[in-house]
A protein has these predicted regions:
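Structural and coupling elements of P-loop NTPases
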Residues: 1-244
Length: 244
């Protein structure tokens, strides 16, 4: 990734704001990594569309936005780097709206909120003419506009594995979002795969972690909407489903 200067694999983190846990996933923007983009978009309830205040929408912006709109995700447009000397705020705002119309966005999607940010300064504002003092306007908009997960913790467990990690102590680690049910350390689960009817392996959850800040925190149980990293299945792969 460093060599190419682009994001290839998604990065997960989570922050707490006003007693709400917000999972944030930085996904690739390039069509070359469409499979990764597809998996990540199915893990989220909404998207922040990051657009450079000087460069405007890029070709990869179109690709990711199109997939997000097709999945009927709510979109918050974040025009970033507004402190650039060559920033074109009004023009870029128009370019984003034109892109949304070109992609046949619904009326609701065309009315997506816009936030004007400086990532370097850590500020956000609802107006292109006002410099923010912190990122509260961005997080308030997320809480107001992006729907919460709709899973049922009393339903059978359902987790789609969207990424794989590895640790020399516990081996392969599956990463995914809990859609329904509750995942608990020590519980017996079944690993299946939609594309391989013969794969039905029973195993035990050995360790369970949630993403917090730039690291992971061990937990004993997790609920719908939580993005978790778990071990216990030696041959788990992307696309597997973990169920009870």
């Amino acid at each position: 990734e460093r060599e190419r200067g682009i994001t290839i694999l998604a990065k997960n983190t989570a922050v707490h704001y006003k007693d709400v846990k917000i999972n944030i996933i930085d996904t690739p923007g390039h069509a070359d990594f469409g499979g990764e983009v597809e998996r990540i978009l199915k893990m989220v309830n909404g998207v922040l569309l990051l657009v450079d205040a000087a460069e405007g929408p890029m070709p990869q912006t179109r690709f990711v936005l199109q997939r997000a709109l097709e999945l009927n995700h709510r979109v918050i447009v974040v025009i970033n780097k507004i402190d650039k000397p060559d920033a074109r705020l009004e023009e870029v705002e128009e370019e984003v709206l034109e892109l949304l119309m070109d992609l046949d966005a619904t009326d609701e999607q065309l009315d997506s909120p816009m936030i004007f940010c400086s990532g370097r300064a850590g500020t956000a504002s609802l107006s292109p003419y006002e410099q923010g003092t912190d990122l509260k306007p961005l997080f308030d908009t997320i809480l107001e506009y992006i729907p919460a997960p709709s899973g049922d913790e009393n339903a059978p467990l359902q987790v789609l594995v969207s990424s794989i990690d590895y640790n020399e102590y516990v081996g392969r680690i599956g990463i995914g979002r809990i859609e329904n049910g509750k995942m608990t350390v020590g519980e017996q689960v079944v690993i299946t795969n939609y594309h391989d009817e013969t794969k039905k392996k029973r195993t035990k959850i050995v360790s369970l972690e949630q993403f917090t800040g730039l690291g992971r925190t061990p937990v004993t149980e997790a609920y719908p909407g939580d993005i978790v990293a778990f071990s216990g299945a030696e041959d788990i792969t992307i696309g597997d489903t973990v169920c009870s």
